[in-house]
């Protein structure tokens, strides 16, 4: 793990904690360029905004605003949890070359598809990410199941 990965995951984890404190699903994400500029950050807001699509990664993209697509090719997207199918699609669409996740214990997303498409996938197995997500799933299983399409 590099300093950049620690920094990036901490930004994403802070977003996850913010979502949890708002009564939402504790998944956070951020987009950091190669010069360590945070271009966008966000958290899952499906509950807070009654949204079908505002997962953590989608929220970070939304909050980055309108940027040229090529911008993302030089960025790493950090997420506290393995990306789902929808977020994986967005990662591939915008050409991210690197994804760093906090964990994939509570949910195993589409890491294989990312790797098959040339994206570097790094799993930090962060215990704080694992514990926060597990706590939420235990407290609100119906909200979690809705978030993952079950």
From Swiss-Prot:
One of its GO terms (biological process) is cytosine metabolic process. Its EC number is 3.5.4.1. It comes from the Eukaryota. Gene3D superfamilies: Cytidine Deaminase, domain 2. One of its GO terms (cellular component) is nucleus. The keyword Plastid does not apply. InterPro entries: APOBEC/CMP_deaminase_Zn-bd (IPR016192), CMP_dCMP_dom (IPR002125), Cytidine_deaminase-like (IPR016193). Its main location: cytoplasm. The active site is at residue 57. Pfam families: dCMP_cyt_deam_1. Pathway: Pyrimidine metabolism; UMP biosynthesis via salvage pathway; uracil from cytosine: step 1/1. Zn(2+) binds at residues 55, 84, 87. It is found in: Cytoplasm; Nucleus. Homodimer. The keyword Cytoplasm applies. Its cofactor is Zn(2+). One of its GO terms (molecular function) is cytosine deaminase activity. Substrate binds at residues 44, 147. It catalyses: cytosine + H2O + H(+) = uracil + NH4(+). This is Cytosine deaminase. Residues 3-121 form the CMP/dCMP-type deaminase domain.
């Amino acid at each position: 793990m590099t300093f950049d990965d620690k920094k990036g995951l901490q930004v994403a984890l802070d977003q996850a904690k913010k979502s949890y404190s708002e009564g939402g699903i504790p998944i956070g994400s951020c987009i950091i360029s190669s010069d360590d500029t945070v271009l966008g950050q966000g958290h899952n807001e499906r509950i807070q905004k009654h949204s079908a699509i505002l997962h953590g990664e989608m929220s970070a993209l939304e909050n980055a605003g309108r940027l040229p697509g090529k911008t993302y090719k030089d960025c790493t997207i950090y997420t506290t949890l393995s990306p789902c199918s929808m977020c994986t699609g967005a990662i591939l669409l915008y050409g991210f070359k690197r994804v760093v996740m906090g964990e994939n214990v509570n949910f195993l997303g589409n890491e294989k598809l990312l790797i098959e498409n040339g994206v570097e996938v790094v799993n930090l197995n962060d215990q704080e990410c694992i514990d926060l997500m597990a706590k939420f799933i235990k407290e609100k299983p119906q909200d979690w199941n809705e978030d993952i399409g079950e």
